[in-house]
Regions:
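PLD/PLD-like phosphodiesterase catalytic module centered on the HKD motif
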Residues: 1-277
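Phosphate-binding P-loop
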Residues: 278-282
């Protein structure tokens, strides 16, 4: 549960890594609301360990993005929203090892998995434009666990692999009960934006989202906004010196959580729920 985690007040690259915060929050949560400017699915790949447990445990994610995506991400989102998914074995979602491998690689299977998760509303996207003519540039979010406990954050990091593993980024974290008022503010901000009830953002169809090859945006600016989705796990040009791994404490915690019983995806039968509750009480 989120209340059992001693989150730090802030996380900064090179010290307490933002990636460490996101991973630990994901494995303790059942819902993740993310208010963004720029989204890249490479952020999911960077957090593959956390996302695999989050999804396998029934987690649901809602994401508010601006009107620029990579070509591959836009296609994956459109395919999911239109239920255009072929040859994806949904049972992989309850196999944590296979799911982690799927989410960590930039390949066709990853994007099919992303599309499938979108098609069954496990990950939802809403695209927005600013009413002021600029770019949506919010960077905040709220995690919620199955008991309703919440943790919020705000900071400099876009949701991408570059931001989580290479850039210098800082985020501030708000936890219960000391920061309940601030958490409620961010939850309200997200919910209003999601319902299209805010004066500074307007919803647009994903079809209208621009891709990084759009000529209206300078190449240099786009490269700054959206990373090139380099697979840092397999690219030897990136030294481990620059990419700080997850702490051993968190890796040990992930390993323990992988052993917890969970319901086969996607249905949860009453007999399984009773067996699970009996196991927990022993």
């Amino acid at each position: 549960m989120l209340k059992d985690v001693k989150f730090k007040h802030s996380y900064s690259s090179g010290y307490d890594e933002p990636k460490e915060f996101f991973t630990e929050a994901l494995i303790e949560s059942s819902a993740f609301d993310l208010g963004l400017g720029f989204f890249s699915s490479s952020g999911i790949r960077s957090l593959a360990y956390g996302f695999a447990l989050f999804i396998a445990n029934g987690g649901k994610m809602r994401v508010i993005i601006n009107h620029i995506l990579s070509k591959e991400d836009k296609q994956a989102i459109e395919n999911g929203q239109k239920h255009l998914i072929e040859d994806f074995e949904c049972r992989v979602l309850s196999d944590i090892d296979k799911l982690t491998k799927t989410l960590s690689k930039e390949d066709e299977h990853f994007f099919r998995c992303l599309s499938y998760l979108i098609s069954i509303n496990r990950i939802e996207f809403i695209a927005t434009i600013s009413t002021k003519g600029g770019l949506g540039h919010d960077k905040y979010g709220v995690f919620t666990d199955e008991k309703g406990c919440k943790v919020a954050f705000i900071g400099s990091a876009n949701f991408s692999q570059s931001a989580l593993e290479l850039n210098g980024e800082t985020i501030t974290v708000f936890t219960s009960p000391d920061d309940n008022k601030r958490i409620a503010e961010y939850k309200t901000l997200f919910d209003r934006s999601w319902e299209n009830d805010t004066p500074h953002l307007l919803h647009i169809p994903i079809d209208n989202v621009k891709t990084i090859i759009c000529e209206k945006f300078p190449k240099i600016a786009i490269e700054e906004l959206l990373d090139n989705s380099v697979n840092l796990r397999t690219d030897n040009s990136y030294s481990n010196t620059y990419i700080k791994p997850l702490s051993q404490r968190l890796l040990d915690k992930i390993e323990l959580k992988e052993q917890e019983p969970r319901f086969p995806f996607p249905e949860e039968r009453s007999i399984q729920i009773n067996a699970y509750n009996a196991w927990i009480s022993n």
